[in-house]
């Protein structure tokens, strides 16, 4: 069983690279803290595989979150404090996992990579 964590970010917000990096870092930590301890240990041992993908809207992001939760996957939302680029409370990303790669791919397999 191969594990990974997927972070999906909103491309419509047009965040700066630095801001985007911080949102992805927040998401990775949220997913780690919410995951089962046995999965967390295995994921760490495997090298902490992460993939960052993008969606075009908040609605699409929330749909991905709902689909992941319906499959029993751990998720978490990142909401920005609003101190720099976006208003307070803006949802910028969702994290899925870490969990089994094949399970996460059922939710995110068709999403484009963030480049």
From Swiss-Prot:
Taxonomic lineage is: Archaea, Methanobacteriati, Methanobacteriota, Archaeoglobi, Archaeoglobales
Q: Where in the cell is it found?
A: Cytoplasm
Family to which this protein belongs:
Belongs to the PTH2 family.
Any Pfam family the entry gives: PTH2
Instruction: Tell me yes or no: is RNA-binding among this UniProt entry's keywords.
Output: no
**By what name is this protein known?**
Peptidyl-tRNA hydrolase
The record's Gene Ontology biological-process terms are: translation
Cross-referenced InterPro entries, in alphabetical order? Pep_tRNA_hydro_II_dom_sf, Pept_tRNA_hydro_arch, PTH2
Q: What keywords are assigned to this protein?
A: Cytoplasm, Hydrolase
Can you state which reaction this protein catalyses? an N-acyl-L-alpha-aminoacyl-tRNA + H2O = an N-acyl-L-amino acid + a tRNA + H(+)
Q: Name which cysteines form disulfide bonds.
A: none
